[in-house]
Amino acid sequence: MRRREVVTLLGGATAWPFAARAQQPKPNVGYLSGRSAETDAAMLAAFRRGLGEGGYVEGRNLAIEYRFTDGRYERMAALLAELIGRKPEVIIVVGVTAEPTLLRQMKTSQIPIVFVTGADPVRTGLVASLNRPGGNVTGICTLVSEMIAKELGLLRELIPSAKTIAMLWNPHNSSEEPNEAREVTAKLGLQLNVLNASTDSELNDAFAMLDHQRANAILVTTSPFYLTKAKQIAALAAQYRVPAIYVRREYVEAGGLMSYGYDIFDSYRLVGVYSARILKGDKAGDLPVLQPTKFELVINLKTAKTLGITFPPGLLAIADEAIE
């Protein structure tokens, strides 16, 4: 065999593994949210940043399949089953509820799952413990029930004369929030009225009841459905001239009075970081469930003026951002 033929054959043999690598399919990630694509846009950007920190870029070396329920909790289980059927390498589930079918699917999935939930995942049986989740599940736990005491305290500081506080709550959520709120309001000497709402019409009805209940303020709890209706809820609070506190800054940006909650963007970045680690071989059950460490108070001075409210100096001093 002539030397040129030998060199050609060797060169071709050397190129085969490179060609094989180039033809390998991109890893696939499933993303399921209880909100809408529009509502999740900023959080998804943070999620992609976290993936990027691990070396994964959507469209380049990673594919992502998205599913959104647009605030309709009843669709979560069906859409998760659909994603599981697509057999991605990892699935992100945002807005985990206490719905038994959804929890059972997540616990028994052979595909690693990274969640974002406001409920205690140990109490709901989703993980064995926060430090050692076990199984095939891990994620971010915001434990919103623990923020309720702070939020109610802020309302009390804003309106010292308040006697009755209303609480807007989605009954599809865990019962931890109203139970925690009842304990806190009892200690503060306040009456708590829980208003259930999980549809547009129920939101309108809930706010219409505020005058009848003589509520001095309202606490709007966390809910993917509520977040998709942030503008509507902020407008209702303005219409009925009731001071409101929210968990997320998006409500304040939509015209709400004030919010106190965790830094959602940092949490979603960490979801991306965890997803990248799992794609590289880490087991979900070995990764501890993370909790937020960054919190922020955002106030809307324009809304306060419209309501005839003046933020006390103490609240102004600790606010992370004031929207004018």
Locations of regions flagged by a protein language model:
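Short hydrophobic alpha-helices and adjacent helix-cap/hinge residues
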Residues: 1-324
